[in-house]
Amino acid sequence: MATLFHLIDVHGNEYQNVQDHSLQMALEELNQQIEVIQRQEEQLALRKKAIEDARQEVLQQIQHRKFRQYLHEREQEARLQEYYLEQLQERRAFENVVRTIIRKRFEDEERERAHRREKAARKLLRRILVSDSPNMQLVVPNNFQQMFIHHPVVDTIYSPEESSESQAEVADQQTGPYSTSEYAGAQQSQPFRIFIQNDNAPEQQSGPDVAELNTLPNRSKTSSQASVSDEELSRTELAELNDYLLAAQRRSNKRGNARKHIDLTARESPSTSFAQMSKGALNPDPEVIEPEDEPTTFRNPLEALLSTGQYSVVSSDEDVESVRDPDDGTLPIHSTQTVEEPIDTKAGEKLTDSSKQPSPPVAEHFSNETFSASPKGAETDVKSEGSNNHEQGSFNEPKSNVDSNDSASPKRPSSQASLRHNVTVEEVPDEDA
């Protein structure tokens, strides 16, 4: 029966039974659905591609915009840096100009200050010195070189081989009140001496500005021997030492007066005018030392005492005890208050005694001996016309007390103001001649 019935579909496919035909129809439907799905996938792929292209374009636009903004910021930063660099260069150029002007002004002020300091030092040292000699030596205290002993120039000046010769010379030169046991320590080391430049010469003259040092002190040098020799310092060494001295003075003068802070010597400071002058040389301040009213020329102390009108010089053979004048501690002169004697005996001695000349002028340095160097062993006797007032008594001190109290001058009694003293210089003609 199978051969009698043939199943033929629309397309001409021949089937043997119905199940085969139904399966074939289901397969065709599935194929159609697959085709529809494939077409949808193609459409979705196209849409996806379009979306991706749009997205990439938008991202590229965003990147371009950011890059343009970055470039703009970099250009602005570069312009700001150029502007700031120009401003900094202008400011530095202005600062350099101002700094150059200020430096030149400071150099000018320092030069003027150094010039004024040199002029003040020269003026002060001219005022301190007694004589106008070009080789005048100013003797400062003994350990003055300890302030700048570490300077290399000082080591060459104060060498050990020169110390023995300098000590022998200093021992010969030490005379007068400085030869006592109080100043025996001055011969232990070489004193520091400063040679003052002659101010009468023009300023263009070669030589140090403020002072020059001499290694071997010798008071008997002439002006021809005071010239610069090979043993003395050179110009550069003098300038270096001058700067070092100014720096030492500036360091010592930081907290005020240098005399209050520097202990120059271990011994007690003497009260003489020469030692005070030496102290004043350590602090050359023009405001400290007032200008002198009297001229600086040296006067004979005997003439100075006679010009006061309180003493009179007469000739006598009688030994009168000497009393040191309280105004001048270095000159041993006889006091006006002598031991009481009758007036007629004094007149008799004046008539019988031969004329004696007064003592010769005293040298610059006095010795501690009594003033008894007149010819024929005569002594200068100072009389007082008020000796007849017995109620006022005698104010003469013993000679032992005067010698013991040599450093401190005795006080004058209060009742001396009531005495009147007149100058009576009497010269009796020489009868023997």
Swiss-Prot record:
Residues 343-353 have a biased composition (Basic and acidic residues). One of its GO terms (cellular component) is cytosol. The keyword Coiled coil does not apply. Residues 172-184, 215-228, 385-421 have a biased composition (Polar residues). It comes from the Eukaryota. Residues 159-184, 200-234, 252-433 are annotated as: Disordered. Keywords: Phosphoprotein. The modification Phosphoserine is found at residues 227, 229, 269, 409, 415, 418. The keyword ATP-binding does not apply. This is Protein slt1.
